[in-house]
UniProtKB/Swiss-Prot annotation:
Residues 1-10, 422-449 have a biased composition (Basic residues). There is a cross-link at residue 144 (Glycyl lysine isopeptide (Lys-Gly) (interchain with G-Cter in SUMO2)). This is Something about silencing protein 10. Citrullinated by PADI4. The gene is UTP3.
Length: 479
């Protein structure tokens, strides 16, 4: 209906223009006649709209004809540009990029397919999957088929399965490497432990506040070998002092002849001294709190300890001889000391010695007199100083008194306290606790006159200890 009305309006408008003749035109040749009616297409469309409408009609007509004829060939239409844009360079660049991307994709496809083909070629044909699905379906393997099979066929199948399992096991064993036998796969699941610097975790303790028991406990925990080394040091030093040094003196005196025995004593003496010096060095490290676990002194101590243990066999053999030599030396020393003790007895003094002693006494008396004079002189100096000090104090008090006469008068105690008209209170009222205590004491005194105090029995009569005898009379007769 709308199309028919539009056509009628257009026909009427064409008839009117034909009757009117030629219309006015502008400089560009555009028609300047009467405006179009609402029913005409030019009322709401311009030339661009007319062009697009004609193009869509042609496309629809062509498509309808192709559908009717059944022709499936696609025809390319030439498009006419309405508003041409200069997009040639950008199209070329886009086309080039697209071509490069396509080439890369093709290359990737070719590379992937080649790698896949190489991998498939390297795989053992017995391990590769088949190309047909039918091989893996519709088989007779199952409980029903087993019932129909004979015992020989079942045993043969079991043997084949066992062989196949052994082949798979060998193949897996060949694929194993050295890394598979380690614990790296376990360490991969382990939680990372945060590494803390020793300087951060080090706690400095005040050892002065720690008890002796705790100190020993800490010492045994940090270095258990320290106490053993200290005891060993004491033992070795006593052995060097009491046994080896006296024996070496006998060697130097020639009592012990030179030979293997003297060489053994010198070796043992040097070994013990070196061992003790290394222990003392170890104790110095411990006193300075230097870590000695990796120090070379530990290895040196171990070597010396091993050498001492080797000498223990010789010590057991020579222990009796060493004791005999030490006893002989002690006896000789005692014999030397006995005559010296006898010679220390007092002897009668001669006249010359007595006179010398008297002179010494007189000298001492002279010295004592000199000391007394020095003391008296010192006391006099002290008295003079005290007198001067007193004079200075008296002079200062007089000067202050003269100054105070001209100065202002000091305030009194009453002015300083500023108590005003407050009433006078007793001294006992200052402390309530003492006040109530005194009150309680006086109340107890008053109560003694009102109520008699309870007196407990001190000792109850328990009868005569030896019984009462009727014949004994202890009364006094009146005369």
């Amino acid at each position: 209906m709308v199309g028919r009305s539009r056509r009628r309006g257009a026909a009427k408008w064409a008839a009117v223009r034909a009757k009117a003749g030629p219309t006015l035109t502008d400089e560009n040749g555009d028609d300047l006649g009467l405006p179009p009616s609402p029913g005409d297409t030019s009322y709401y469309q311009d030339q661009v709209d007319d062009f697009h409408e004609a193009r869509s009609r042609a496309a629809l007509a062509k498509g309808w004809n192709e559908v009717q004829s059944g022709d499936e060939e696609d025809g390319e239409e030439e498009e006419e540009e309405v508003l041409a844009l200069d997009m040639d360079d950008e199209d070329d660049e886009d086309g080039g990029n697209a071509g490069e991307e396509e080439e890369e994709e093709n290359a990737d496809d070719d590379g992937g397919s080649s790698v896949q083909s190489e991998a498939e070629a390297s795989v053992d044909p017995s391990l590769s999957w088949g190309q047909r699905k039918k091989l893996y379906y519709d088989t007779d393997y199952g409980s029903k088929s087993r019932g129909r099979q004979s015992q020989q066929e079942a045993e043969e199948e079991e043997r084949e399965e066992e062989e196949e399992a052994q082949i798979i096991q060998r193949r897996l064993a060949q694929a194993l490497q050295e890394d598979d036998f380690g614990v790296a796969w376990v360490e991969a699941f382990a939680k990372p432990v945060p590494q803390v610097d020793e300087a951060e975790t080090r706690v400095v303790k005040d050892l002065a506040k720690v008890s002796v028991k705790e100190k020993l406990k800490m010492l045994r925990k940090e270095s258990p070998e320290l106490l053993e080394l200290i005891e060993d040091l004491k033992v070795k030093l006593t052995e060097v002092k009491d046994e080896l040094e006296p024996l070496l003196e006998l060697v130097e005196q020639g009592i012990i002849p030179p030979g293997k025995g003297s060489q053994y004593l010198r070796t043992k003496y040097n070994l013990y001294l070196n061992y003790c010096s290394n222990i003392s060095f170890y104790l110095i490290l411990k006193a300075r709190r230097v870590p000695a676990h990796g120090h070379p002194v530990i290895e040196r101590l171990v070597t010396y300890r091993n050498l001492i243990n080797k000498l223990s066999v010789v010590d057991q053999k020579l222990s009796s001889e060493i004791r005999h030599l030490l006893t002989l030396k002690d006896d000789a020393v005692k014999k030397e000391l006995i005559p010296k003790a006898k010679s220390t007895k007092p002897k009668p003094k001669s006249v010359s010695k007595t006179s010398a002693a008297a002179c010494a006494v007189t000298d001492l008396s002279d010295d004592s007199d000199f000391d007394e004079k020095a003391k008296l002189k010192y006391y006099k100096e002290i008295e003079d100083r005290q007198k001067l000090k007193r004079k200075k104090e008296e002079n200062s008090t007089e000067e202050q008194a003269l100054e105070d006469q001209n100065a202002k008068r000091a305030i009194t105690y009453q002015i300083a306290k500023n108590r005003g008209l407050t009433p006078r209170r007793k001294k006992i009222d200052r402390n309530p606790r003492v006040k109530h205590r005194e009150k309680f004491r006086r109340a107890k005194i008053r109560r003694r006159g009102q109520v008699r105090e309870v007196r407990k029995e001190e000792q109850r009569y328990s009868g005569e200890l030896s019984g009462i005898r009727a014949g004994v009379k202890k009364s006094i007769k009146l005369k």
